């Protein structure tokens, strides 16, 4: 009985921590850059693009393909940064919990 109460308490604590982390992640802003800073994309914790900056030198018809590649590279870098931040947050939250190694949390 004592073990069950302890598990329920830990589950409630974990739920509260998860909610806090989700709120923190929603407010997180990361920027990915490409082309030595010619293109930058900022994402929030929900992987929503909040800003795109493009150096005017890339706004030429003959530079379209390069620009497209740089936008994708900047987005992918920003997305990777968000994923790393989420992993770090969830790792600290789940420390000490008996979870299977491949257990996926709902927001990771």
Curated annotation (Swiss-Prot):
For molecular function, the Gene Ontology terms on record are: DNA binding
The parts of the chain that form a coiled coil are none
Q: Does the keyword Transferase apply?
A: no
* UniProtKB keywords: Cytoplasm, DNA-binding
Q: Where does the source fall among the domains of life?
A: Bacteria
Keyword DNA-binding listed: yes
User: InterPro entries attached here?
Assistant: YbaB-like_sf, YbaB/EbfC
Where it mainly occurs, coarsely classed, is: cytoplasm
Described by its record, this protein's role is as follows: Binds to DNA and alters its conformation. May be involved in regulation of gene expression, nucleoid organization and DNA protection.
- Name it: Nucleoid-associated protein BH02310
Which lineage is the organism of this entry classified under, starting from the top rank? Bacteria, Pseudomonadati, Pseudomonadota, Alphaproteobacteria, Hyphomicrobiales
